[in-house]
């Protein structure tokens, strides 16, 4: 993904302002609520029967934290997303058999969560830069599928 120096600065600056652990859990939870078919990949997470059950689920929050920490790795390696996510791409393709479209969906949900958490600081320029990043991450995670 190609980002200008200004875009990289926006992404790293905005990401540094959020509570990574919280936004990860919120983003994954919202994904599971808004796109309920994605729940099939999380059978071991227990009660996913309602929005409140999902958003309060400790396993959703814990996995969301892992996802967000992975995004932190990507933010630190914006020039090498493919390499950064190579092992995760292999895991999600070969072992977990996750539909790669779900990576794009989660990225879009994450952008919404960032907007909610950052408010006016999340400018249109920051949103556009983050959209590039989450698309780049989704593409890198889907790489093994091709």
UniProtKB/Swiss-Prot annotation:
Binding site residues for heme b: 63, 92
Tissue specificity as recorded in UniProt: Red blood cells.
UniProt entry keywords in alphabetical sequence: Acetylation, Heme, Iron, Metal-binding, Oxygen transport, Phosphoprotein, S-nitrosylation, Transport
InterPro entries listed in its UniProt record: Globin (IPR000971), Globin-like_sf (IPR009050), Globin/Proto (IPR012292), Hemoglobin_b (IPR002337), Hemoglobin_oxygen_transport (IPR050056)
Gene Ontology process terms (BP): hydrogen peroxide catabolic process
Iron keyword on record: yes
Modified residues (N-acetylvaline): 1
Residue span, Globin domain: 2-146
GO cellular component, one term: hemoglobin complex
GO molecular function: haptoglobin binding; heme binding; hemoglobin alpha binding; metal ion binding; organic acid binding; oxygen binding; oxygen carrier activity; peroxidase activity
Alphabetized PROSITE patterns for the sequence: GLOBIN
Pfam families for the chain: Globin (PF00042)
Chain positions with S-nitrosocysteine modification: 93
Chain positions found as N6-acetyllysine: 59, 82, 144
Keyword Heme: yes
Modified residues (Phosphothreonine): 12
Residues with Phosphoserine modification: 44
Its job: Involved in oxygen transport from the lung to the various peripheral tissues.
Family: Belongs to the globin family.
Assembly notes: Heterotetramer of two alpha chains and two beta chains.
Name of protein: Hemoglobin subunit beta
């Amino acid at each position: 993904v190609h980002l200008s120096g200004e875009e990289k600065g926006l992404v790293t600056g905005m990401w540094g302002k959020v509570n990574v652990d919280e936004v990860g859990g919120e983003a994954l939870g919202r994904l599971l609520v808004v796109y309920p078919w994605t729940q099939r990949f999380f059978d071991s997470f227990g009660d996913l029967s309602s929005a409140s059950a999902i958003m309060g689920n400790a396993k959703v929050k814990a996995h969301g934290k892992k996802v967000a920490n992975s995004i932190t790795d990507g933010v630190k390696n914006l020039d090498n997303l493919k390499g950064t996510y190579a092992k995760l791409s292999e895991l999600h393709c070969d072992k977990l058999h996750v539909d790669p479209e779900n990576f794009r969906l989660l990225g879009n949900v994450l952008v919404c969560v960032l907007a909610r958490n950052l408010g006016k600081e999340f400018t249109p320029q920051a949103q556009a830069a983050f959209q590039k990043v989450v698309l780049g991450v989704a593409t890198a995670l889907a790489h093994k599928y091709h």
